Amino acid sequence: MAAQKKQGERVLPARSTRKRRQLPDMLYYDERTDSYVTPQERSLSEANAQTRPAPNTINQAVDAKQSAREARVQELMKSKLYHLRKQQKQARHKRDQWAIDYLEWKKNEDEDVWNSDAEATGPAEHTSSFLDALRFSQQFMKAE
């Protein structure tokens, strides 16, 4: 369907000619295989899913899925990346530990402040009572 062109008119294409960004083939998570699959494999697995498996095969599939997951976890534990992340985490903890300790200490310091409502005697009263005790004991020192 070619557009009719009048004199001095530009013919614009029906669709933009700008180069389109090619989207990558997305991977979809497939619950049945417990893995990531391409769209073609996904449509195949959906077609296979239309036929219902027997109950005992479901249990076998669950067991297989579980063992596959455990194997992957073991792989991850052994992998270098896991250990690198673990070391980074420990280093971060060591680096920030002083701040955590300081906050704990500061909190305790703030709690130690004398509360005049809760206590009948404060630092000044303690000092004066100590001086009174000294004076009292001096009487006996003189007597001896």
From Swiss-Prot:
Compositional bias segments (type: Polar residues): 35-58
Cited function: Component of the INO80 complex which remodels chromatin by shifting nucleosomes and is involved in DNA repair.
Domain of life: Eukaryota
Region (Disordered): 1-58
Predominant location: nucleus
Protein name, UniProt field: INO80 complex subunit 5
GO BP, sorted A to Z: DNA repair; DNA replication-dependent chromatin assembly; transcription initiation-coupled chromatin remodeling
Coiled coil start-end: none
Localization terms from the record: Nucleus
GO cellular-component term (any): nucleus
Species per Swiss-Prot/TrEMBL record: Schizosaccharomyces pombe (strain 972 / ATCC 24843) (Fission yeast)
